[in-house]
Protein backbone atom coordinates (compact mmCIF):
# COMPACT_ATOMS: atom_id res chain seq x y z
CA UNK A 1 0.00 0.00 0.00
CA UNK A 2 1.33 3.43 -0.96
CA UNK A 3 2.22 5.58 2.03
CA UNK A 4 0.40 8.89 2.24
CA UNK A 5 2.75 11.85 1.97
CA UNK A 6 2.54 14.28 4.90
CA UNK A 7 2.23 17.73 3.33
CA UNK A 8 2.64 21.00 5.21
CA UNK A 9 -0.32 23.24 5.98
CA UNK A 10 1.42 26.16 7.61
CA UNK A 11 -1.73 28.28 8.01
CA UNK A 12 -3.18 25.81 10.51
CA UNK A 13 0.07 24.49 11.93
CA UNK A 14 1.14 28.00 12.94
CA UNK A 15 -2.20 28.55 14.66
CA UNK A 16 -1.67 25.37 16.67
CA UNK A 17 1.96 26.17 17.51
CA UNK A 18 0.84 29.56 18.84
CA UNK A 19 -0.92 27.71 21.70
CA UNK A 20 1.79 25.09 22.32
CA UNK A 21 2.69 24.58 25.99
CA UNK A 22 -0.27 26.58 27.25
CA UNK A 23 -3.02 25.17 29.45
CA UNK A 24 -5.43 25.58 26.54
CA UNK A 25 -6.61 22.30 25.02
CA UNK A 26 -6.17 22.52 21.26
CA UNK A 27 -9.35 21.27 19.55
CA UNK A 28 -9.20 20.75 15.77
CA UNK A 29 -12.63 20.51 14.18
CA UNK A 30 -13.84 20.07 10.62
CA UNK A 31 -15.43 17.68 8.16
CA UNK A 32 -14.05 14.16 8.03
CA UNK A 33 -10.93 13.78 5.81
CA UNK A 34 -10.19 17.52 5.67
CA UNK A 35 -6.71 17.01 7.15
CA UNK A 36 -7.10 17.11 10.93
CA UNK A 37 -5.20 13.86 11.52
CA UNK A 38 -2.36 15.04 9.29
CA UNK A 39 -2.17 18.27 11.29
CA UNK A 40 -1.81 16.22 14.48
CA UNK A 41 1.06 14.32 12.87
CA UNK A 42 2.63 17.56 11.65
CA UNK A 43 2.44 18.98 15.16
CA UNK A 44 4.02 15.85 16.64
CA UNK A 45 6.73 16.09 13.97
CA UNK A 46 7.30 19.74 14.91
CA UNK A 47 7.73 18.74 18.56
CA UNK A 48 10.30 16.08 17.67
CA UNK A 49 12.17 18.56 15.48
CA UNK A 50 12.39 20.96 18.42
CA UNK A 51 13.79 18.47 20.93
CA UNK A 52 10.78 16.65 22.37
CA UNK A 53 11.55 12.94 22.74
CA UNK A 54 9.32 10.07 21.61
CA UNK A 55 8.54 9.00 25.16
CA UNK A 56 6.99 12.43 25.76
CA UNK A 57 4.44 11.96 22.97
CA UNK A 58 1.30 9.81 23.23
CA UNK A 59 -0.73 9.47 20.03
CA UNK A 60 -4.11 7.71 19.96
CA UNK A 61 -6.37 7.44 16.92
CA UNK A 62 -9.72 6.10 18.09
CA UNK A 63 -10.66 5.03 14.57
CA UNK A 64 -7.75 2.57 14.54
CA UNK A 65 -8.25 -1.10 15.40
CA UNK A 66 -4.95 -0.79 17.24
CA UNK A 67 -6.65 1.16 20.02
CA UNK A 68 -8.85 -1.07 22.21
CA UNK A 69 -12.44 -0.09 22.97
CA UNK A 70 -12.53 1.76 26.28
CA UNK A 71 -14.69 3.94 28.45
CA UNK A 72 -13.56 7.11 30.20
CA UNK A 73 -11.96 5.18 33.10
CA UNK A 74 -10.10 2.84 30.75
CA UNK A 75 -8.98 5.84 28.70
CA UNK A 76 -7.64 7.55 31.81
CA UNK A 77 -5.77 4.47 33.04
CA UNK A 78 -4.32 3.78 29.56
CA UNK A 79 -2.84 7.28 29.36
CA UNK A 80 -1.79 7.39 33.02
CA UNK A 81 0.34 4.27 32.51
CA UNK A 82 2.21 5.99 29.67
CA UNK A 83 2.68 9.49 31.13
CA UNK A 84 6.31 10.60 31.07
CA UNK A 85 7.54 11.29 34.59
CA UNK A 86 9.43 14.51 35.34
CA UNK A 87 8.88 15.83 31.80
CA UNK A 88 5.90 17.30 29.99
CA UNK A 89 3.84 14.79 28.01
CA UNK A 90 2.14 15.76 24.75
CA UNK A 91 -1.22 14.03 24.25
CA UNK A 92 -2.75 13.63 20.77
CA UNK A 93 -6.27 12.17 20.62
CA UNK A 94 -7.80 11.70 17.16
CA UNK A 95 -11.63 11.39 16.94
CA UNK A 96 -11.78 11.30 20.72
CA UNK A 97 -15.58 11.61 20.76
CA UNK A 98 -15.74 7.85 20.17
CA UNK A 99 -14.91 7.37 23.87
CA UNK A 100 -18.05 7.70 25.98
CA UNK A 101 -17.38 10.30 28.67
CA UNK A 102 -14.08 11.35 27.10
CA UNK A 103 -14.44 14.91 28.41
CA UNK A 104 -14.14 13.62 32.00
CA UNK A 105 -10.88 11.87 31.15
CA UNK A 106 -9.43 14.83 29.25
CA UNK A 107 -10.26 17.20 32.09
CA UNK A 108 -8.55 14.81 34.52
CA UNK A 109 -5.41 14.70 32.36
CA UNK A 110 -5.31 18.48 32.47
CA UNK A 111 -5.66 18.54 36.25
CA UNK A 112 -3.50 15.53 37.21
CA UNK A 113 -0.54 15.63 34.81
CA UNK A 114 1.99 18.02 33.30
CA UNK A 115 0.68 17.70 29.78
CA UNK A 116 -0.19 19.56 26.60
CA UNK A 117 -3.38 18.26 24.95
CA UNK A 118 -4.44 18.16 21.29
CA UNK A 119 -7.70 16.59 20.12
CA UNK A 120 -9.72 16.31 16.89
CA UNK A 121 -13.35 15.68 16.10
CA UNK A 122 -15.53 15.51 13.01
CA UNK A 123 -18.73 16.69 14.63
CA UNK A 124 -19.68 19.91 16.42
CA UNK A 125 -21.15 17.70 19.17
CA UNK A 126 -17.53 17.56 20.35
CA UNK A 127 -17.89 21.17 21.46
CA UNK A 128 -21.33 20.74 22.96
CA UNK A 129 -22.49 21.92 26.33
CA UNK A 130 -20.92 18.87 27.99
CA UNK A 131 -17.45 19.91 26.90
CA UNK A 132 -18.13 23.53 27.76
CA UNK A 133 -19.14 22.49 31.26
CA UNK A 134 -15.87 20.67 31.94
CA UNK A 135 -13.47 22.78 29.93
CA UNK A 136 -15.06 26.23 29.78
CA UNK A 137 -12.42 28.80 28.92
CA UNK A 138 -9.73 26.13 28.71
CA UNK A 139 -9.83 25.14 25.06
CA UNK A 140 -9.17 26.86 21.75
CA UNK A 141 -10.87 25.67 18.57
CA UNK A 142 -8.86 25.48 15.35
CA UNK A 143 -11.40 25.20 12.53
CA UNK A 144 -9.90 23.12 9.72
CA UNK A 145 -11.23 23.36 6.17
CA UNK A 146 -10.38 21.57 2.92
CA UNK A 147 -7.59 23.03 0.81
CA UNK A 148 -7.64 26.61 -0.40
CA UNK A 149 -6.87 27.18 -4.08
CA UNK A 150 -3.29 28.07 -3.16
CA UNK A 151 -2.93 24.91 -1.08
CA UNK A 152 -4.51 22.91 -3.91
CA UNK A 153 -1.74 24.05 -6.25
CA UNK A 154 0.93 23.18 -3.70
CA UNK A 155 -0.52 19.75 -2.85
CA UNK A 156 -0.79 18.83 -6.53
CA UNK A 157 2.81 19.74 -7.26
CA UNK A 158 2.46 23.17 -8.86
CA UNK A 159 4.81 26.05 -8.11
CA UNK A 160 3.51 29.62 -7.93
CA UNK A 161 5.86 32.51 -8.72
CA UNK A 162 5.25 36.22 -9.26
CA UNK A 163 6.93 38.82 -11.38
CA UNK A 164 6.20 42.47 -11.98
CA UNK A 165 3.88 43.17 -14.90
CA UNK A 166 4.67 45.99 -17.37
CA UNK A 167 1.02 47.03 -17.01
CA UNK A 168 1.38 47.39 -13.24
CA UNK A 169 0.93 44.97 -10.38
CA UNK A 170 2.27 41.44 -10.46
CA UNK A 171 1.79 38.62 -12.93
CA UNK A 172 1.44 35.14 -11.48
CA UNK A 173 3.12 32.18 -13.16
CA UNK A 174 2.43 28.54 -12.35
CA UNK A 175 4.76 25.72 -13.33
CA UNK A 176 5.18 22.06 -12.47
CA UNK A 177 8.37 20.41 -11.21
CA UNK A 178 9.65 20.08 -14.80
CA UNK A 179 9.17 23.78 -15.47
CA UNK A 180 6.14 23.45 -17.76
CA UNK A 181 3.84 26.47 -17.50
CA UNK A 182 0.11 26.12 -16.74
CA UNK A 183 -2.76 28.54 -17.18
CA UNK A 184 -4.04 29.81 -13.82
CA UNK A 185 -7.68 29.78 -14.95
CA UNK A 186 -7.36 26.20 -16.18
CA UNK A 187 -6.12 25.07 -12.77
CA UNK A 188 -8.82 27.07 -11.02
CA UNK A 189 -11.41 25.28 -13.15
CA UNK A 190 -9.97 21.97 -11.91
CA UNK A 191 -10.24 23.22 -8.31
CA UNK A 192 -13.83 24.38 -8.89
CA UNK A 193 -14.64 20.97 -10.37
CA UNK A 194 -12.88 18.54 -8.03
CA UNK A 195 -12.59 20.59 -4.83
CA UNK A 196 -9.93 20.69 -2.18
CA UNK A 197 -10.10 17.45 -0.22
CA UNK A 198 -6.44 16.73 0.65
CA UNK A 199 -6.55 13.03 -0.26
CA UNK A 200 -7.04 13.91 -3.94
CA UNK A 201 -3.36 14.82 -4.06
CA UNK A 202 -2.64 11.12 -3.45
CA UNK A 203 -5.32 9.58 -5.69
CA UNK A 204 -5.01 12.03 -8.60
CA UNK A 205 -7.60 14.08 -10.50
CA UNK A 206 -8.97 11.42 -12.83
CA UNK A 207 -12.76 11.59 -12.59
CA UNK A 208 -13.25 7.95 -11.51
CA UNK A 209 -10.65 8.22 -8.75
CA UNK A 210 -12.05 11.53 -7.52
CA UNK A 211 -15.60 10.16 -7.46
CA UNK A 212 -14.53 7.09 -5.47
CA UNK A 213 -12.61 9.20 -2.97
CA UNK A 214 -15.47 11.68 -2.47
CA UNK A 215 -17.95 8.82 -2.17
CA UNK A 216 -15.87 7.57 0.75
CA UNK A 217 -15.96 11.00 2.40
CA UNK A 218 -19.70 11.39 1.91
CA UNK A 219 -20.49 7.90 3.22
CA UNK A 220 -18.28 8.40 6.27
CA UNK A 221 -19.91 11.72 7.11
CA UNK A 222 -23.47 10.46 6.72
CA UNK A 223 -22.95 7.11 8.45
CA UNK A 224 -20.37 7.91 11.15
CA UNK A 225 -20.99 11.56 11.91
CA UNK A 226 -24.75 11.77 11.51
CA UNK A 227 -26.58 8.42 11.72
CA UNK A 228 -24.21 6.70 14.18
CA UNK A 229 -23.80 9.84 16.27
CA UNK A 230 -27.55 9.99 16.73
CA UNK A 231 -27.44 6.50 18.23
CA UNK A 232 -24.62 7.47 20.60
CA UNK A 233 -26.57 10.50 21.76
CA UNK A 234 -29.50 8.26 22.60
CA UNK A 235 -31.71 10.44 20.41
CA UNK A 236 -33.47 9.41 17.21
CA UNK A 237 -34.13 12.70 15.45
CA UNK A 238 -32.52 11.45 12.23
CA UNK A 239 -34.53 8.34 11.38
CA UNK A 240 -35.07 8.64 7.63
CA UNK A 241 -31.90 8.23 5.50
CA UNK A 242 -33.90 8.92 2.32
CA UNK A 243 -35.14 12.27 3.65
CA UNK A 244 -31.60 13.09 4.79
CA UNK A 245 -30.28 12.46 1.27
CA UNK A 246 -33.04 14.62 -0.27
CA UNK A 247 -32.20 17.51 2.05
CA UNK A 248 -28.49 17.15 1.27
CA UNK A 249 -29.22 17.29 -2.46
CA UNK A 250 -31.50 20.31 -2.02
CA UNK A 251 -28.92 22.27 -0.02
CA UNK A 252 -26.14 21.32 -2.44
CA UNK A 253 -28.24 22.50 -5.38
CA UNK A 254 -29.14 25.77 -3.64
CA UNK A 255 -25.83 27.07 -2.29
CA UNK A 256 -26.00 30.84 -2.05
CA UNK A 257 -29.80 30.95 -2.26
CA UNK A 258 -32.03 32.16 0.56
CA UNK A 259 -33.29 29.01 2.27
CA UNK A 260 -35.56 28.01 5.13
CA UNK A 261 -36.83 24.71 6.51
CA UNK A 262 -40.30 25.65 5.26
CA UNK A 263 -39.09 26.28 1.71
CA UNK A 264 -37.24 22.95 1.72
CA UNK A 265 -40.37 21.06 2.79
CA UNK A 266 -42.50 22.78 0.17
CA UNK A 267 -39.98 22.02 -2.58
CA UNK A 268 -39.69 18.36 -1.59
CA UNK A 269 -43.45 17.98 -1.93
CA UNK A 270 -44.03 20.18 -4.98
CA UNK A 271 -41.28 18.54 -7.01
CA UNK A 272 -42.23 15.02 -5.97
CA UNK A 273 -38.90 14.39 -4.27
CA UNK A 274 -40.43 12.23 -1.52
CA UNK A 275 -42.00 9.68 -3.86
CA UNK A 276 -39.18 7.14 -3.65
CA UNK A 277 -39.09 7.12 0.14
CA UNK A 278 -41.35 5.72 2.84
CA UNK A 279 -42.57 9.16 3.90
CA UNK A 280 -45.99 9.98 2.43
CA UNK A 281 -46.58 13.47 3.86
CA UNK A 282 -44.57 16.65 4.07
CA UNK A 283 -42.12 16.45 6.99
CA UNK A 284 -42.63 18.90 9.82
CA UNK A 285 -40.54 22.07 9.83
CA UNK A 286 -38.95 20.94 13.11
CA UNK A 287 -37.95 17.63 11.49
CA UNK A 288 -36.29 19.36 8.55
CA UNK A 289 -34.54 21.75 10.93
CA UNK A 290 -33.18 18.81 12.94
CA UNK A 291 -31.77 17.26 9.76
CA UNK A 292 -30.16 20.55 8.72
CA UNK A 293 -28.60 20.94 12.17
CA UNK A 294 -27.15 17.44 11.89
CA UNK A 295 -25.57 18.41 8.55
CA UNK A 296 -24.08 21.62 9.91
CA UNK A 297 -22.82 19.81 13.02
CA UNK A 298 -21.02 17.36 10.71
CA UNK A 299 -19.44 20.36 8.95
CA UNK A 300 -20.72 19.41 5.50
CA UNK A 301 -22.84 22.58 5.26
CA UNK A 302 -22.25 25.97 6.87
CA UNK A 303 -25.08 28.38 7.64
CA UNK A 304 -24.61 32.10 7.09
CA UNK A 305 -27.06 34.57 8.61
CA UNK A 306 -28.29 37.91 7.29
CA UNK A 307 -27.28 41.19 8.93
CA UNK A 308 -29.24 44.42 8.54
CA UNK A 309 -26.52 46.99 7.85
CA UNK A 310 -28.69 50.01 8.69
CA UNK A 311 -30.49 48.42 11.64
CA UNK A 312 -27.24 46.84 12.90
CA UNK A 313 -28.87 43.56 13.87
CA UNK A 314 -29.00 39.96 12.70
CA UNK A 315 -32.17 38.83 10.98
CA UNK A 316 -33.81 35.52 11.88
CA UNK A 317 -35.07 34.60 8.43
CA UNK A 318 -33.75 33.64 5.01
CA UNK A 319 -30.17 32.71 5.70
CA UNK A 320 -28.07 30.76 3.23
CA UNK A 321 -26.04 27.56 3.23
CA UNK A 322 -22.70 26.81 1.58
CA UNK A 323 -21.12 23.39 1.13
CA UNK A 324 -17.71 22.86 2.71
CA UNK A 325 -16.12 21.48 -0.46
CA UNK A 326 -17.25 22.26 -3.99
CA UNK A 327 -15.99 18.85 -5.14
CA UNK A 328 -18.53 17.20 -2.84
CA UNK A 329 -21.26 19.27 -4.46
CA UNK A 330 -20.21 18.13 -7.91
CA UNK A 331 -20.03 14.53 -6.70
CA UNK A 332 -23.60 14.80 -5.38
CA UNK A 333 -25.15 16.65 -8.32
CA UNK A 334 -23.01 15.42 -11.19
CA UNK A 335 -20.11 17.20 -12.84
CA UNK A 336 -22.36 19.53 -14.78
CA UNK A 337 -21.67 22.89 -16.37
CA UNK A 338 -23.34 26.07 -15.21
CA UNK A 339 -23.99 27.78 -11.88
CA UNK A 340 -20.41 29.07 -11.85
CA UNK A 341 -21.54 32.25 -10.08
CA UNK A 342 -22.72 30.38 -6.98
CA UNK A 343 -19.67 28.12 -7.12
CA UNK A 344 -17.37 31.17 -7.05
CA UNK A 345 -19.42 32.62 -4.19
CA UNK A 346 -19.04 29.35 -2.26
CA UNK A 347 -15.27 29.34 -2.80
CA UNK A 348 -14.88 32.98 -1.70
CA UNK A 349 -16.99 32.39 1.42
CA UNK A 350 -14.72 29.61 2.65
CA UNK A 351 -11.61 31.58 1.74
CA UNK A 352 -12.82 34.36 4.04
CA UNK A 353 -13.38 31.81 6.81
CA UNK A 354 -9.86 30.41 6.29
CA UNK A 355 -8.45 33.89 6.75
CA UNK A 356 -10.11 34.15 10.13
CA UNK A 357 -13.14 36.30 9.32
CA UNK A 358 -16.62 35.95 10.74
CA UNK A 359 -18.95 36.20 7.75
CA UNK A 360 -22.56 37.35 7.37
CA UNK A 361 -24.82 38.34 4.48
CA UNK A 362 -25.47 42.08 4.31
CA UNK A 363 -28.94 43.56 3.79
CA UNK A 364 -29.32 47.24 2.98
CA UNK A 365 -32.82 48.40 2.08
CA UNK A 366 -34.02 45.84 -0.48
CA UNK A 367 -30.53 45.02 -1.75
CA UNK A 368 -27.92 42.50 -0.67
CA UNK A 369 -24.20 42.49 -0.08
CA UNK A 370 -22.84 38.97 -0.53
CA UNK A 371 -20.57 39.04 2.50
CA UNK A 372 -19.73 41.20 5.50
CA UNK A 373 -16.37 39.91 6.76
CA UNK A 374 -15.24 40.98 10.24
CA UNK A 375 -12.13 40.21 12.27
CA UNK A 376 -11.34 42.13 15.47
CA UNK A 377 -11.55 45.81 14.44
CA UNK A 378 -11.35 44.98 10.73
CA UNK A 379 -14.40 44.87 8.48
CA UNK A 380 -14.91 44.57 4.74
CA UNK A 381 -17.95 44.41 2.50
CA UNK A 382 -17.55 41.92 -0.34
CA UNK A 383 -19.51 41.43 -3.55
CA UNK A 384 -18.79 38.35 -5.68
CA UNK A 385 -19.61 38.10 -9.37
CA UNK A 386 -18.50 36.20 -12.45
CA UNK A 387 -17.87 39.31 -14.54
CA UNK A 388 -17.72 43.09 -14.20
CA UNK A 389 -17.50 43.71 -17.93
CA UNK A 390 -21.18 44.40 -18.69
CA UNK A 391 -22.39 47.88 -17.56
CA UNK A 392 -25.62 46.50 -16.04
CA UNK A 393 -23.68 43.92 -14.00
CA UNK A 394 -21.24 46.56 -12.81
CA UNK A 395 -24.12 48.78 -11.66
CA UNK A 396 -25.89 45.88 -9.90
CA UNK A 397 -22.79 44.91 -7.93
CA UNK A 398 -21.72 48.45 -7.02
CA UNK A 399 -25.15 49.84 -6.06
CA UNK A 400 -25.53 48.25 -2.59
CA UNK A 401 -21.93 49.07 -1.69
CA UNK A 402 -22.46 52.74 -2.58
CA UNK A 403 -25.31 52.87 -0.06
CA UNK A 404 -23.08 51.90 2.85
CA UNK A 405 -21.98 55.07 4.62
CA UNK A 406 -19.21 53.83 6.90
CA UNK A 407 -15.53 53.94 5.95
CA UNK A 408 -14.74 50.22 5.99
CA UNK A 409 -13.25 48.58 2.90
CA UNK A 410 -15.62 47.72 0.07
CA UNK A 411 -14.54 45.33 -2.67
CA UNK A 412 -15.96 43.46 -5.63
CA UNK A 413 -14.31 40.12 -6.44
CA UNK A 414 -14.87 39.13 -10.07
CA UNK A 415 -13.70 36.16 -12.09
CA UNK A 416 -13.53 38.34 -15.17
CA UNK A 417 -12.44 41.97 -14.96
CA UNK A 418 -9.62 44.25 -16.00
CA UNK A 419 -6.63 44.81 -13.75
CA UNK A 420 -7.41 45.82 -10.16
CA UNK A 421 -9.18 49.16 -10.23
CA UNK A 422 -11.17 51.46 -7.97
CA UNK A 423 -14.55 53.04 -8.66
CA UNK A 424 -16.35 55.33 -6.20
CA UNK A 425 -13.90 54.17 -3.54
CA UNK A 426 -14.80 50.53 -4.19
CA UNK A 427 -11.94 48.23 -5.16
CA UNK A 428 -12.58 45.77 -8.00
CA UNK A 429 -10.18 42.82 -7.98
CA UNK A 430 -9.81 39.59 -9.90
CA UNK A 431 -10.90 36.47 -8.05
CA UNK A 432 -7.75 34.55 -8.94
CA UNK A 433 -5.58 37.36 -7.56
CA UNK A 434 -7.61 37.37 -4.35
CA UNK A 435 -7.41 33.60 -3.92
CA UNK A 436 -3.65 33.57 -4.52
CA UNK A 437 -2.81 36.45 -2.15
Question: Where are the predicted features?
Answer:
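A cross-kingdom feature that marks ATP-driven nucleic-acid transaction machinery
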Residues: 2-5, 23, 29, 38, ...
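Short glycine-rich substrate-engagement loop in P-loop NTPases that contacts/grips substrate
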Residues: 58-87
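Pre-Walker A adenine-sensing motif
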Residues: 3-21
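Structural recognition of the conserved hydrophobic beta-strand(s) that form the central parallel beta-sheet
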Residues: 116-122, 143
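Short regulatory helix/loop adjacent to the ATP-binding pocket of P-loop NTPases
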Residues: 125-141, 153-158
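Interdomain hinge/linker elements that couple catalytic modules in large macromolecular machines
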Residues: 6, 159-344, 350, 358
